[in-house]
Amino acid sequence: MISEAPPFWWRKADWRAWLLLPVSFLYGRIAGHRMAHGRRASVAIPVICVGNFTVGGAGKTPTALTIARAAKAKGLKPGFLSRGYGGSLDVTTVVDPDHHRAVAVGDEPLLLAREALTVISRRRVDGAQRLVAEGADLIIMDDGFQSARLAIDYALLVIDATRGLGNGHIVPAGPVRAPIRQQLRSATALLKVGGGNAADRIVRMAARAAKPYFTASLKVRGDNTLAGMKVLAFAGIADPAKFFRTVESRGAEITVAKSFGDHEHLTEDEIDDILTTAERQDLLIVTTSKDFVRLSGHPGKAAQLAEKCRVIEVDMVFEDHLAPSLIIDRAIVACRERRLREMKAGIKAMPGKAGPL
């Protein structure tokens, strides 16, 4: 999967998109066939997948965290499953936020592990087995909707209302990961994030396909006011502009804005440039929680930058505060129905304790 989304993906299709359409057609055929016909392994506990239609960030990780908190409030032990994108470890691993660094396990798994049991695995089936062995009674997949490796009981697709589907084309002509109709058939529900109208078309398509949708927004955690402050804001996420808007919404004046690639680890020169610029212009340094965890645990200038950063943390807040609990309940029911079908067909789930029924 392409890790960086070219800017033209998020604008009206131009000659670059049209030039790549033949490749997109082939990619879409393969991705759609895999989603429709992939042999999915089954686990004995409910699986919720938080995914999206497109490459890049839409708010999957904050959504997964919100669902995990709702699960814990219901007395469940949720476990996150991630591929560990951006990390170097290629073995199935239980993430320890006090021991591991982002360079090894990825930035998002470190954030998830602060909330609940988290396993990274290049093979999602192996990761799911490990979560069951570790005592999880609910799996929350952060991404992986299109992978067709694991049986999913509830697929929640997150879509950014300000970006939507971009130019609407499939990779590499655009940001869409697989044919939209196939993705909708495999989805359980949509989550529209933010107040824009770029997602209205896909929401209407979902409604015609009898798929429910929820609405939510990203809210800054705590009283993190920046009123009247001049700041240097840096972000290495899929949509840095969204972070910069969030900073400005807190009353800050962004004097310097620096964007880096999603999941990118800063070089010593880049860190030095941020520190020097902020000191020379007397600026407060602000960044995202993902960028902060990539700095944490490193010596030298990375530690200096981490110490000087103001971290702007955000939470995914559902308009209907009961929605996360409802999603969990629906996943549990779907898991029970899946297991009954498998029992009748003589299919055995992977070993592990039975999920909540």
Swiss-Prot record:
The keyword Ribonucleoprotein does not apply. It is an enzyme of class 2 (transferase). It holds the Pfam family LpxK. Pathway: Glycolipid biosynthesis; lipid IV(A) biosynthesis; lipid IV(A) from (3R)-3-hydroxytetradecanoyl-[acyl-carrier-protein] and UDP-N-acetyl-alpha-D-glucosamine: step 6/6. Its EC number is 2.7.1.130. InterPro entries: LpxK, P-loop_NTPase. One of its GO terms (molecular function) is tetraacyldisaccharide 4'-kinase activity. Keywords: ATP-binding, Kinase, Lipid A biosynthesis, Lipid biosynthesis, Lipid metabolism, Nucleotide-binding, Transferase. It catalyses: a lipid A disaccharide + ATP = a lipid IVA + ADP + H(+). GO terms for cellular component: plasma membrane. ATP binds at T54, V55, G56, G57, A58, G59, K60, T61. Transfers the gamma-phosphate of ATP to the 4'-position of a tetraacyldisaccharide 1-phosphate intermediate (termed DS-1-P) to form tetraacyldisaccharide 1,4'-bis-phosphate (lipid IVA). Belongs to the LpxK family. This is Tetraacyldisaccharide 4'-kinase.
